Swiss-Prot record:
Record Pfam families: cNMP_binding, Lactamase_B
Residues given in the record as a divalent metal cation binding sites: H573, H575, D577
Natural source organism: Dictyostelium discoideum (Social amoeba)
UniProt: a nucleoside 3',5'-cyclic phosphate 1 binding residues: 783-930
GO biological process: adenylate cyclase-activating G protein-coupled cAMP receptor signaling pathway; adenylate cyclase-activating G protein-coupled receptor signaling pathway; cAMP-mediated signaling; cGMP-mediated signaling; protein localization to cell cortex; regulation of positive chemotaxis to cAMP by DIF-1
Positions of the UniProt region annotated as Disordered: 216-248
Protein's recorded name: cAMP/cGMP-dependent 3',5'-cAMP/cGMP phosphodiesterase B
Amino acid sequence: MNSKYGDNIIDFLRYLEKFVKSLTKDNKIEEFKTFDIKSLLYPRNKDYFGNLSKFLLAVISARIGSNFINEDDIFEISELLKEFLGQELEHLPYLSYEELYVEIVEQVGEINGTVSEIIEAITVTIDFLDTFEKVSQTIDRSNEKQKLLAYLSAPVNQLDNSVSGVFNENDYTDIQRFFTELTNENNQSPDSNISILINDFQSLLNILESQQASSSSSKMIINDSPRTQQRNGTTEQQKKQQQQQYLQKNKEPFYSKDKIMQVSGPSYVFTPSDCNVSIQVGIPPDTLKRDQSICHFIVPHFLISKDVSLSEVEFPIFYNKFVQKGKTKVVIICTVEQKQRIETILCESIFGPAPEHIYTDEEITIPDYKIDLLTERLAIDPRANDEKLDSYVIFKTFDTFGVVDIDLPSASDPTKLINLRIRNTKGLISFHEDYHVVQKQLHLKLQEQQQDQQDKSSSSTTDKQMINTSGNRIILKNNTVSVIDSTIESQYVPVLPFGNDHEQVKKFKAPILGVTFLGVSHGLDFTHCSHTTGFIIWINGSGVVVDPPVGNTTYLQTNGIYGKTVEHIILTHCHADHDSGILQKIIERNKVTLYTTKTINESYMRKLKALTGLPEQSLKNYYTWVPVTIGNKIKILGAEFEFDYSFHVIPTIRFKLEIYNKKISYSADTFYDLQKFKQLKDQGVLSKKRIERLKSFVFDADMIIHESGVAPIHTPMANLLELPSEIRKKIRVVHCSSSVDTKGEIIRPKEGLENTEIIKVDRKYKGVAECIQIQTALNHCSVFSKLSPAEVQRVFFLCKKIWVKRNDVIIKKGSPSDMFYIILSGKVLVYENEYEPIKSTTSVGTVVTDTTTITTTVKTDAIKIPTIKLCAGETLGESALQLDKNIDASATVIAETDVCLLVWKTMDLRTEFHSNLNTFISKVHMDLSHINSCRDAIIRAFQHNITQHINKEEVDSIANGSKDVSFAHHQVIFNEGDTSDSMYIIKQGRVRIHSKKNKNIIRYLNVGDFFGETAYRRSNEDSNFLPTRSFTATAIDPTILLKLDIESIVNPRIQNIIEQKAKKNAEDNIRYHAYSPKIRTPRTPRKVYPIEGLSI
């Protein structure tokens, strides 16, 4: 037998020795004392998983990061490792090493660790798996297989004496029996069987080895005894807070920093050595604003991150096609399935809907008015029918092994090409440079090894290369391989966020009629702080947003404007610079209302379905579509809207509205050219009526919002300057850069709330508008949701509207709670702890009501952190509604900006409802102590995926419609098959979701997790329909749950939030089961391929 391979096996046991010794020396987890190494040699059972969990936990906690595992978390992490990693290990005979490696890395990454630690862990883990794979294949081919296995499991006296301090003879007897059993199982290849033992130990051992140099500086300070904690003056709660702060401070994305650069949002750029061509992973909407030179893009694991598309390739394509005149094509690297989805998106954007998806015949109600959108497209672009998608873009798809090979030009020698292999393993993207060159080098090295098998130095070269058995991957050390985890769903941060060029608005009141421009530029404008065209039309204090730009939601929320203030959307067409921001609005909080034609809505639905991967029915639950027609006017927020199709390359609607004898119009993207219209009329392409409406539809208004751009897709500025002067001065030109020359005759509006243009209406309409605004606030307020219409009317007449100046006190803690408030505009800060500023400087402010002036005083220069921030639509002073009690305020409330409030005095409400006071109190009652105790759990439950910011009023509504239910340790909450009549949020404790029928654990839930989502279906089905539970839920610890009955929450908006969360939970569970190892289809075990040059 070749002694070199015997030495390699001894080295393996030495590594194992080193690993166990390090645990013995450094580990401080009390639970690990019960670890029994011998139990890992037996078949899978309860003891095996328990010890495996402790084993992995010890490695992770001791060597990856520091200060992030608490003693209380040991059991939880152990259970999770049993559930995920343990079950994956059960399927090792059907898994490749690389798949196992990804599973391990995912578990480590979820727990935490620094970037350098995780990258190093990946490198050494792959190194070991590849190396041991070759060793196992060598064993399998050997004629002396039995002898080699016996040598592997030899007693301790046959090995180096240094291992004697780790194992005793009984340990090696067990190991010997284990390997003997391997050889008796039909002489099966040890490839899969040995990997059970090796991967249990060695994959994470390499993580330990990679961090050995820094181990002395990474000592754990967890699991100190109570005596030690007392001595250090640190309580367990303080320690948890410190650990949480550490995690937040040190949380980093997972990528190779030496070769990969993080750029805007969750996207990254890789530049190969000796190459000027970069490759970007992730394509957020503002990619071109950062860099116009990149034309190679890798689509990440998820096409969207949070609420933003990471596959926004439309404008890189348009830039290369129209600005660069087709010098280069965009290269998209993705999976086959992603290619199909992206093709759908691009076809809708570039070519528009197919003929069978155009419904103008049923959308137009005007007699003798015909619009042939396909013919008009050809009139604008005569080559439209000849171009195919491949004239814009090149797709390169990963093969069945997750591999793409590309050649890039060398920077030092343009005549040569650089070989690059890109590998996608379940979202882990790795770049392997000079793959083909190295493959040849490896072949030569293996031949050299075959000539001199006795030369041990050949196995320890510093420039070591490895190839796996299927020949799909080369791993080179010395930073030749770079990796990026594309499964990270980090928060999108635009390159140029809204508000970057102006301060946060200190005072904003939505006007009766006006326009706020969120963006006035286009997708190919790369100048500072340019945003794509979109705007809000304010009507009676509420907003209709037109083509919302990306980032608008964050900007509005920063200034205290949330979904219910702007929950109506008009979509003009399906180009990325007009529809990208709608996704943010759809999932912001409320179920928004979308106004557009059937043709455009179905086109957008096809794009959205391809982007999200969700079925159409699920997407329809996130917004309500209101079809608009050409010829029939519709009412939105009291204004009368009229729509028509513009003259554009894909179906696009324009509109005008009228209210209070004032008109606003919008052209949308269009080509306005009188000479072209005349030419097309002479050719019989456009009818006389069509031309008349194209010439006059938008110009009959008090404010004309008109686009401008490059012909023939857009309207040249010169054409607008030819309009009569009385029209030009009413135009607000958009969709153009700041460099456009308007000759001083046409206004290019400014962006931002502070630049809102107000259209003055007759004084007689102001009272009507104010009544509508108050009534809207009452309708949205969940506190009054149980009142009858007559009672709401009585409440309406009792309110007063007041203004509070910035920094003034609205409510002082400890003062009588005798007023209830609804915020109409502005933001306030709530301080539950005593509000005591450091300095004693005082300022005096005033609160002006319709009839009174109230003087207030507040100390300035405070540094106290507010408990909560509140904005428009939210409520204050709820304790004042307990009309049968006199209660003091529990918090101080300060105006962060100028604030407009609706106010009800307790005394007025008592007087108005004195005859049925108890009935009124029961309808508006809110259990404030219960609500406060529930707040954290509810915010955790609803802040992910469904809504980024669930506000106080919504939290209060959900909490007020819930009740606490308690369960003891191991008590069943509900069983599979039980009637599903309620949903739950975990307020305290933990819950195990499992299937008694299938005898498996589905997942573990913690504080803030939401479950029991099948109950929401009751509100959508026949009253006789009773859904049943699909799993069993059991309390692991003493647990308190918030029980939600959908019938107890009558506000439709709050019901929608809960139902969206329930549907998202159901979709997540489907995905979870789809990737669960329990139901994964087993694959055929891998064939063992011989490695040339290795023999015994």
